[in-house]
Amino acid sequence: MSRIEELQQEAIELLQGLINTPSLSSEEDQTAALIKKWLEKHGVSCKQQRNNVYAINKHEDPSKPYLLLNSHHDTVLPNSGYSRDPYKAAIEDGKLYGLG
């Protein structure tokens, strides 16, 4: 398996973990912990404030411009028409399905 394939598999596993973890708005402490643990495992310095996780590039150079990547990790309550288990990441035909 190439390094790119390894990283792709790790990204899929992280996404599956996030999908499998309920994270309704204001209740995303478990997904915040999952993200922080993943970053720390990969040697990325990070801080957590409430459910927000802040990470700094380990190759940070103060003489260069900064780039902010921002995302949310909360979800809305699944509606009654949802046809799958919303908290079970499923891969079918090369596609990943789940709430999020």
What are these regions (language model features)?
Residues S2-L99:
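Acidic/His- and Gly-rich active-site-bordering loop/insert found
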